[in-house]
């Protein structure tokens, strides 16, 4: 075991897969010589060569098209979109092509592409560097969308994503890259895509979250415990497909739930989770399922970021509303 930050765990996963499979290729803006803007690919070009880890022009649409072509030729591309706010430039490649080629060809061709991309707020970056746009891609059939909250999860899920024969969007929260360390196995291991994780056991209310909001939820749960409220925290880890079994099992146990996301409230992952709970566990509920989310505005300037982003206080307030219903 080694103490790793999330970005170190990601680099470790990439190194393992480059060693394991000669068809794995890593490319994107600045990922080669400079090792990525956040150094997630640092040292990989020197170790594996310019044919395996290489830089691209500043053109997300080109990165997406290259990934599709390489996948059709039998490679296992791992492109990086430098910030997920720039995903608009490559949406046709992702949703119009990658997600559909297996279906269009009757399963004759696969798209073993893992798109890595930093996202999320809390580090005072401009809006296109901070947006949480996971809802855009989670809606598209044929894609898997993974959002880890810990170094351990990041490494195991990234290895699983690279080995998957379908396209995976692997989103890495900026705030979590170096915010803490965790013991991570030094060898290879996998975590199943589509499997949530109960990060804290509880009996009174279920708090469902993903990404950086898992840590806000855990902080809220610790505060709620002081007031006699036992909160269970479920980390989705994968937002498409959802782990319905774990979600419903927890809600049926506690009878109450809130869903927490960093993204804007409208048409988000949280709304989808709430709908699934209402459709499958309505008779187990003691109160309505509520959401914690950002306002439905464009991501603000850095000066207003702290009041715009959801935090543990919002989680506590919403949990108490449900408990007092």
Curated annotation (Swiss-Prot):
Record carries keyword Oxidoreductase: yes
Top-rank taxon: Bacteria
InterPro entries: THDP-binding, Transketo_C/PFOR_II, Transketolase-like_Pyr-bd, Transketolase_C
Pfam families: Transket_pyr, Transketolase_C
Cofactor(s) in the UniProt record: thiamine diphosphate
Swiss-Prot/TrEMBL keywords: Oxidoreductase, Pyruvate, Thiamine pyrophosphate
Catalytic activity: N(6)-[(R)-lipoyl]-L-lysyl-[protein] + pyruvate + H(+) = N(6)-[(R)-S(8)-acetyldihydrolipoyl]-L-lysyl-[protein] + CO2
Record-listed thiamine diphosphate binding positions: 60
GO molecular function: pyruvate dehydrogenase (acetyl-transferring) activity
EC number: 1.2.4.1
Catalytic class of the enzyme: oxidoreductase
Subunit structure: Heterodimer of an alpha and a beta chain.
Function: The pyruvate dehydrogenase complex catalyzes the overall conversion of pyruvate to acetyl-CoA and CO(2). It contains multiple copies of three enzymatic components: pyruvate dehydrogenase (E1), dihydrolipoamide acetyltransferase (E2) and lipoamide dehydrogenase (E3).
Official protein name in the record: Pyruvate dehydrogenase E1 component subunit beta
Species assigned in the record: Geobacillus stearothermophilus
Recorded name of the encoding gene: pdhB
